[in-house]
Amino acid sequence: MSGLPRSVPDVLDPLGPGAPVLVAGGRVTGQAVAAVLTRFGATPTVCDDDPVMLRPHAERGLPTVSSSDAVQQITGYALVVASPGFSPAIPLLAAAAAAGVPIWGDVELAWRLDAAGCYGPPRSWLVVTGTNGKTTTTSMLHAMLIAGGRRAVLCGNIGSAVLDVLDEPAELLAVELSSFQLHWAPSLRPEAGAVLNIAEDHLDWHATMAEYTAAKARVLTGGVAVAGLDDSRAAALLDGSPAQVRVGFRLGEPAAGELGVRDAHLVDRAFSDDLTLLPVASIPVPGPVGVLDALAAAALARSVGVPAGAIADAVTSFRVGRHRAEVVAVADGITYVDDSKATNPHAARASVLAYPRVVWIAGGLLKGASLHAEVAAMASRLVGAVLIGRDRAAVAEALSRHAPDVPVVQVVAGEDTGMPATVEVPVACVLDVAKDDKAGETVGAAVMTAAVAAARRMAQPGDTVLLAPAGASFDQFTGYADRGEAFATAVRAVIR
């Protein structure tokens, strides 16, 4: 279809032919939103404070505006469509909210256009969220759907944006959504949705933990709600869900209406009386987290009728994504594992607990999260810690309180040298890579080389040197993938 219906369905209100829409953000998401709005006959204006981001839109003939000017003109717009990283606290969106102008995200726009039939018969959305495990679970779900012979597309916070896949001939969407995306998707009602777990994260974006949790809960408002029962916050969301069908999953033996583990096999007692799905040993993701991811994916797949055989085939052949518990090397009896995607304390804890003896490389940007409970839970697994990044002192303080006998090394980079370098840890030292930096090596690469070398000196045969940072990477790297690649490069250099 090339335009909005002349008689606009309620689901699209206030979006209609010629409707003036402010697109907040001119980057990749903004480009997709502006293109879709133009295609369907609305009148978008693109807002960004970077002239470089506005130039391509202006060259296409679209009006552009700065955020300060947009604030002054806000009542002239019927709708604002915001990029997912835009916090509700920024002046532009605060002004829109105060003026009563609706604010959608790109996911909300996609949901409404799909529900209105603008791309043909609406798809069934199977949505995954949670603090950790989203990407693995959604990828596993997509593999299950394909193995079951269903026409399914992987999208959202993984793969392609939802707006970019609605033209594809799919009946099902396997959608990973973040709390940012869900915050701006108030009308989303998926066929089935899963909350894997809830832990402190992104508190620099969400005003409170309650707001973060409420955003996650939006995936449980459709037909089938799925949540992890071993996580108290996720379980509470399931109890309060308005969904007609509520399904829990757990590591233990499942009750009726649940999926779980019995006799080392995954078992479905929610969509069948008692159906064995697959052996735990066939799950390629290490530790309890892999079992939980497989259970969540299986619950969503079973909710749309995927048979047990297809689920087992998909899991057995599944390959974990890069920088997610990825074994980089084994040398001298020591295993080196890249879990750079563990960007918050909850994920780091799950990663560490998958191994019996760990030299932990951690640190980065904690985003306002505390990690005392996590460090206490994994202290018995730690035989050493090497700390990097801006918030390394917070990690060191938690270690000093909950794992005081664990030796700790802090790696200091040039721009960090004015920061606190030591805390009261019994066996601690500081490595200043700025004093011995290799020519042409980036700060992040130098930090990681020093960190891996220090970890190697701590480790013994049978140990795992684990990069599970518990923080974001942007203080010293361009992203978690860059951090993971730096780790792999450093490992190869240290063990050769």
Curated annotation (Swiss-Prot):
Location of this chain's protein in the cell: Cytoplasm
GO annotation, cellular component aspect: cytoplasm
Functional pathway: Cell wall biogenesis; peptidoglycan biosynthesis
Pfam families for this protein: Mur_ligase_C (PF02875), Mur_ligase_M (PF08245)
Any one GO MF annotation of this record: UDP-N-acetylmuramoylalanine-D-glutamate ligase activity
Residues given in the record as ATP binding sites: 130-136
Stored Gene3D superfamilies: Mur ligase, C-terminal domain (3.90.190.20), Mur-like, catalytic domain (3.40.1190.10), NAD(P)-binding Rossmann-like Domain (3.40.50.720)
EC numbers on record: 6.3.2.9
Physiological role: Cell wall formation. Catalyzes the addition of glutamate to the nucleotide precursor UDP-N-acetylmuramoyl-L-alanine (UMA).
Cited NCBIfam families: murD
Protein name in UniProt: UDP-N-acetylmuramoylalanine--D-glutamate ligase
